[in-house]
């Protein structure tokens, strides 16, 4: 009887616990760290493309920022 009540309590907790939400997409996280903005497909003429957020979105940042934040050199992929 104890096993039956234990299973029912565990089942109740599993149904009540909300599912975890995923975090920020890695490309968006890197774009935010570089002080950029994710934009659809194209950056404006005042922006420089510094990366890709996800499919169809590019990471853009103003190229004339008074206090420039260095863009890291991408690491090469090993064959």
Curated annotation (Swiss-Prot):
Q: Name one GO molecular function term.
A: chemoattractant activity
Tissues where this protein is expressed: Expressed on differentiated macrophage phagocytizing plasmodium falciparum-parasitized erythrocytes.
GO biological process, alphabetically ordered: cell chemotaxis; defense response to bacterium
Question: Where is this chain primarily localised?
Answer: secreted
For this record, the Gene Ontology CC terms, alphabetical, are: extracellular space
* Signal peptide range in chain numbering: 1-22
Q: Where in the cell is it found?
A: Secreted
- Keyword Cytoplasm listed? The answer is no
Per the UniProt entry, the disulfide pairs are: 38-53, 43-60
Q: What keyword terms does UniProt attach to this protein?
A: Antibiotic, Antimicrobial, Defensin, Disulfide bond, Secreted, Signal
The protein's job, in short, is: Antimicrobial host-defense peptide. Has an antiplasmodial activity.
The entry sums up its family as follows: Belongs to the beta-defensin family.
Task: Give the protein's recorded name.
Answer: Beta-defensin 130B
Which species does this protein come from? Answer: Homo sapiens
């Amino acid at each position: 009887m104890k096993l039956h009540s234990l299973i029912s309590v565990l089942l109740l907790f599993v149904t009540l616990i909300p599912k975890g939400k995923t975090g920020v997409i890695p490309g968006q996280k890197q774009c935010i760290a570089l002080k950029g903005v994710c934009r659809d497909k194209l950056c404006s003429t005042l922006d420089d493309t510094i990366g890709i957020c996800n499919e169809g979105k590019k990471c853009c940042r103003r190229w004339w920022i008074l206090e420039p934040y260095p863009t890291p050199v991408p690491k090469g992929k090993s064959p």
